[in-house]
Amino acid sequence: MPKVLVVATSRKTKGGITSVVKAHETGEQWKKFHCKWIETHRDGNSVRKLWYLATALIEYICLLPFYDIVHIHVGLRTSVNRKLIFARIALLFRKKIIVHFHPATEKHLFDPMFSGNIKHLFELSNKLLVLSPKWIEWINEAYRGNKYNIQVLYNPCPSVKRSIQRENYILYAGILSDRKGYNRLI
């Protein structure tokens, strides 16, 4: 079985990427593929952020020769810049690269200030994972003629045992926008 090095923000950081990686960590595939989580970022001041990045790079370079695949979870802006460093190193070591794209909005795909680094990260990947079919549309619109190997991977959620007797409640906590898919709940 190939071994997977997972590059993502810290377990102690709040947000979607941390939640997704924590959910994957509880799945059987985590053990099956001998996954190891490299924590590249933590909320806090600049010193803490630089410390996390520096220690993550050292750990990553030490472990990378023993792994086959690098699975990079990335958001936008600074996250893309950080993860480009890890992707370039993986390329030097001839590792397969999976980029798991978790952006908050599609607008940066079309913004010249950010789109170059995003495009470069996508080009380095062997597989690009996105959160919904809509993201495939936006990426294809932003980077026409791309040759990305894109696949949708929905965010995991824990299994829940349902009681036979239940009341009907709908709770939606989040931003009401089309990209979040609230219209599919109702």
Per-range role (PLM):
Residues 35-62, 72-83:
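A short, charged, and often flexible helix/loop element on the N-terminal side
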Residues 3-6, 163-181, 185-186:
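Conserved donor-binding/catalytic core segment of Leloir-type glycosyltransferases
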Residues 17, 83, 182-186:
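Nucleotide-sugar-dependent glycosyltransferases with a strong bias toward membrane-associated enzymes
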Residues 75-79, 95-112, 126-127:
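A short, histidine- and acid-enriched strand-loop-helix "catalytic/donor-clamping" loop
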Residues 120-161:
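Donor nucleotide-sugar binding/catalytic pocket of nucleotide-sugar-dependent glycosyltransferases
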Residues 13, 158, 175-178:
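Nucleotide-sugar-dependent glycosyltransferase donor-binding/catalytic pocket residues
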